[in-house]
Structure formats: structure tokens, C-alpha cells
Amino acid sequence: MNEAVTIRGKERYKSGVMEYKKMGYWEPDYEPKDTDVIALFRVTPQDGVDPIEAAAAVAGESSTATWTVVWTDRLTAAEKYRAKCYRVDPVPNSLGQYFAYIAYDLDLFEPGSISNLTASIIGNVFGFKPLKALRLEDMRLPIAYVKTFQGPATGIVVERERMDKFGRPLLGATVKPKLGLSGRNYGRVVYEALKGGLDFTKDDENINSQPFMHWRERFQYCMEAVNKAQAQTGEIKGTYLNVTAATMEDMYERAEYAKELGSIIVMIDLVIGYTAIQSMAKWARKNDMILHLHRAGHSTYTRQRNHGVSFRVIAKWMRLAGVDHIHAGTVVGKLEGDPATTKGYYDICREDFNPMTLENGLFFDQHWASLNKLMPVASGGIHAGQMHQLLHLLGEDVVLQFGGGTIGHPMGIAAGATANRVALEAMILARNEGRDYLHEGPEILAKAAQTCTPLKAALDTWKNVTFNYESTDTPDYAPTPSVSV
């Protein structure tokens, strides 16, 4: 039902239910402004639902609309504040799925707030009944919006200066087993790994303050290990002390204590939420600390191709939010990571400008307005025998974390660390000499292993270990005509 209200002979208002595409949320002739936030959604309408109407509904429900016309729209600049879907394309090789391009006026969002942005973009709209599924694939964040954020607290350049390590990836390891060790034994793992040649060790995502090891005990033993390893090797070392806790007050307390003990880096988990992440990033900037983010929980909404949020969007949000490290995939490891898609993630973290690169899943040009660069972290099922592949695929501005590949070494933790360091140094030398290190990699490693027993043992132990599974999230970039034409 749709009833018109007439005032002085002019139709001013219609009550009732209207199609979203007739309410101003579908504007195929709209030219996005430089200051617009643009979101690309993968829309899967219910059977029988017009894709244009479904896309317009996403625009409406993620901005100003509700299920019926409301007269209070007339009290606002409704034409300005309505999100505008201006393009709908069928997704290549995915029947019944459509890419919807939606522009949002910048004034819809609070400056410098990821929580406010996400409340609209991934809010109630994801539960909308006319849709079978909905996925946020990418976003174009205008410079005017990017400039309202702090960005990474430290950044790659300053982190390298602080560590005094240049021209190669940094090496790390996650302490294993992740749960159950006493504080003393935990600290011993940290010491052995750092002494053997790693730059960092790391708490895992779910080690906080449990009955078997209080957080304060862990921090003390870990920093004792860091200081001892630094004195022994003459190198700056670090360990990611996980300050994730139940409240912000607890997190600040733990972070302050880590600083008092001399730590250069603290860690948080993605599951603490966007407001907490930004709060810790501001603390890290103020206190000259590197902030590591473990992306715990992301696969619950990033892994499936038809519903959720792409990790490329999470990476963009986290660069804005201000973390210094983020796990971004390995390609060759045990966790999800298509090579082309993963390159897109790494480019988001490390480049000043991301051009539209459809083969890497980047649908828009993205300028980062001089925000610091974010160091990607590769971890999960990697070992020394893959060093040539890791260097080729991920470059040098990355932290390579060999957890099992260090602590599972048959000769012990220090030997595992040494194997990884020698493998990396051999590959960097080959690269600097101009050799084709990708194809000569096995030969380079075998030669280095002749004078490094730990590396030989690592190569023998894991030589046949691969994780060759088909990725569930790959780019869709075949050029197609728009259904809006």
C-alpha cells in the first residue's frame, strides 16, 4: 500500500512500502565523488528477487532506509545521505551472484572510527531476508576519510630502525605448545629460539592469563629470556607479549607492565573488537611500542566466497586502525591463502598506493595518504625448505614465523632457529648476487646445509611436507557486461 499526501495541490509524501530502487537507492547514472566511500558487495538474491532491487536494498539498509517509507526523511537531506548503488555486474562463473557497487556520502561516517564505519557497512544489512548471502569484497576509502585515522603506530621503516635489521625478512616463532607450559619453561623456549637466530618470538592467540601461567609470570620470564639472548647475540630481540584481556583496563595494565620490563612490542587479538584495537593502537603510538595483531577469528567471516567480509577489507581497516603487524597469509603454509589474493593483501599492507588490480582482488584504486606501512606476518605450516618460495612470494618486508618449524626441530629449539636463519641468509645472499633463487632454491639450501647440520636436519625432516589444497577464496575478475545496461 502506498498512499499520497497532498498539500496545496502538490504531492509531498507517499506512505507505505516502496521498492528500494524507486526510493533513490539505485542511480545507474551516478558518478561517485572523490570523497565518497565506495563498497563492493557480492550479492546473492533469494530466488525471484530482482538483482537490481536486491542491490538497492543493500544500499538502503546500510544507510538510511527502513522497511517502509517514513515521513521524517523529509526532515533530512535525504538525497545526500542515501547510499547510491550505481552499478551491478554478474559475478563471473557464479550463477545468481552479483557485484554491487555502492557509494556513501562521507558525512554518513564519524571521522576516525572503524566501529562507526562497520556499524553501517556490515550492520543489519547482512541479515536481510531477501538475500541468500552477502559479502563485502572491497572498499575505496577516500583520502579525506583516511586522513582522519592514525594509521600504524610505528610502521615498517621505524620498526626496522628500532630493530637495526635491514634488507631481509624478519624471523619469528610462536611458542609451542600454545597452552600448558609453566612460566619458566615458556621463557626457556623464548631464550632458545632467540639465541638460535630468530628476531622475535610470539605468544599465541589464546595464551592470556590461565591457571597454569599468570600473565605477569609469563611477561617476567619472557623478558628475562629476551635480555639474555640480546646480551649473548649482540642483536636486538623481541617477544610479542599478548595483552588481550577481558577489559580495556586489564589490557592497559598488561601493556604498561610490558613497557616497564623493557619490551619493544605487545600483541592483541582481532577478537577484542575494533574500538579496543584502535584504543591499543593509540596507546602504542603514545608509548613508542610496536603493536602486533593476531587475526584470531577472521576465518569465521572471511573464508567463504559468498558471505561475510573479505580479508582485504579487514587489512584496510586494520591499517587505518593503527596496528603494526598483521597475519596476512603464507600461500605455501597450512592456512588458507591463494597466491594472487594473498599478494593483494600484502600490497594493501605495504604500499603507499594500491592501483586497481583485479587479478589480485583489488577492485579500486586506494591512496593511503602517507599513513605508515603495515608489516605483514606469514605463519602457519612453513619451514626452512620453503625459504626460496617465501622470499619470492612475500618479499623482504615481512615477518616469517616458523613455530613448528623451529620448536619441532629434531635437534632442539636453538637448532631450529639456526636452520631458519641460515636458510634465510643463504637465500638473501643468492638474491643479492642476482641468482635465480626461486628455481635454484633447493640447490642453494642443499649447499648451505653442507656446513650447517641444523639446516640439513630441517630439510631432511620436512622435505616432503606440503599443504596443496585448493583455495576457497580466489579472485573473480573476468570482464563482464553490467546487468544495469
UniProtKB/Swiss-Prot annotation:
Its cofactor is Mg(2+). Mg(2+) binds at K202, D204, E205. Its EC number is 4.1.1.39. PROSITE patterns: RUBISCO_LARGE (PS00157). It comes from the Bacteria. GO terms for molecular function: magnesium ion binding; monooxygenase activity; ribulose-bisphosphate carboxylase activity. The active site is at K176, H294. Pfam families: RuBisCO_large (PF00016), RuBisCO_large_N (PF02788). The modification N6-carboxylysine is found at K202. GO terms for biological process: reductive pentose-phosphate cycle. The record marks K334 as: Transition state stabilizer. The keyword Metal-binding applies. Substrate binds at N124, T174, K178, R295, H327, S379. Keywords: Calvin cycle, Carbon dioxide fixation, Lyase, Magnesium, Metal-binding, Monooxygenase, Oxidoreductase, Photosynthesis. The keyword Metal-binding applies. It is an enzyme of class 4 (lyase). Binds 1 Mg(2+) ion per subunit. It catalyses: 2 (2R)-3-phosphoglycerate + 2 H(+) = D-ribulose 1,5-bisphosphate + CO2 + H2O; D-ribulose 1,5-bisphosphate + O2 = 2-phosphoglycolate + (2R)-3-phosphoglycerate + 2 H(+). SUPFAM superfamilies: RuBisCo, C-terminal domain (SSF51649), RuBisCO, large subunit, small (N-terminal) domain (SSF54966). InterPro entries: RuBisCO, RuBisCo_large_chain_AS, RuBisCO_lsu_C, RuBisCO_lsu_C_sf, RuBisCO_lsu_fd_N, RuBisCO_lsu_N_sf, RuBisCO_lsuI. The basic functional RuBisCO is composed of a large chain homodimer in a 'head-to-tail' conformation. In form I RuBisCO this homodimer is arranged in a barrel-like tetramer with the small subunits forming a tetrameric 'cap' on each end of the 'barrel'. Heterohexadecamer of 8 large chains and 8 small chains. Belongs to the RuBisCO large chain family. Type I subfamily. RuBisCO catalyzes two reactions: the carboxylation of D-ribulose 1,5-bisphosphate, the primary event in carbon dioxide fixation, as well as the oxidative fragmentation of the pentose substrate. Both reactions occur simultaneously and in competition at the same active site. This is Ribulose bisphosphate carboxylase large chain. It comes from Rhodopseudomonas palustris (strain ATCC BAA-98 / CGA009).
